[in-house]
Amino acid sequence: MAHAVQYGFQDAAAPIMEELLYFHDHTLMIVFMISSLVLYIISLMLSTELTHTSTMDAQEVETVWTILPAVILILIALPSLRILYMMDEIETPSLTLKTVGHQWYWSYEYTDYDKLCFDSYMTPTPDLEPGDLRLLEVDNRVVLPTEMSIRMLITSEDVLHSWTVPALGIKTDAIPGRLNQATLMTSRVGIYYGQCSEICGANHSYMPIVLELVPLKYFEEWLLKTL
């Protein structure tokens, strides 16, 4: 999870997040190279009073500065499209979880099981136990199995929300009247925190998300206790 004075991403806990981190580094490298080239040209222009008359109307230069940006955009677009398709495509999910945003809490429904649904509210500060995280703990955590493909169906009952778990690379808008889909899969057991990432009213900051990813055996035991 995030910690104080953190300027980078959280550690990736899902394949999608790993791909997003690689894409971030790839894009940042291109931006750094372009910035270095621009600064170099500016420094040359400021340090010399000579005018290169041969390049003021050169067909070769115009060709280069037309083709080169197109190539750079392609180098950015191709991996981006690949990740978009990876995030959207899901075949035969092992589990489907429906998430509904409300002002100002989340409700969850395990669509593969009858009557397995609950609301998830932020735990008030006076009710926190030692070691709990302020503004991030909830009364009902979402328990999911690891190493399984999970389909998330996300919508809203009132206004726009956004269901976001940074470590898993998920940020999907919850829109009233629309059912959006996201893919969740991780091989790392742990507790992952997120929050609503769309300003949705006075208590927007009090809509935490807590996922508890456990091995399949413990998930089945949790189901037996809950159902």
From Swiss-Prot:
Co-factor remark: Binds a dinuclear copper A center per subunit.
Entry GO terms, CC: mitochondrial inner membrane; respiratory chain complex IV
Localization (cell): Mitochondrion inner membrane
Membrane topology (Mitochondrial intermembrane): 1-14, 88-227
Top-level enzyme category: translocase
Main subcellular location: mitochondrion
Protein name: Cytochrome c oxidase subunit 2
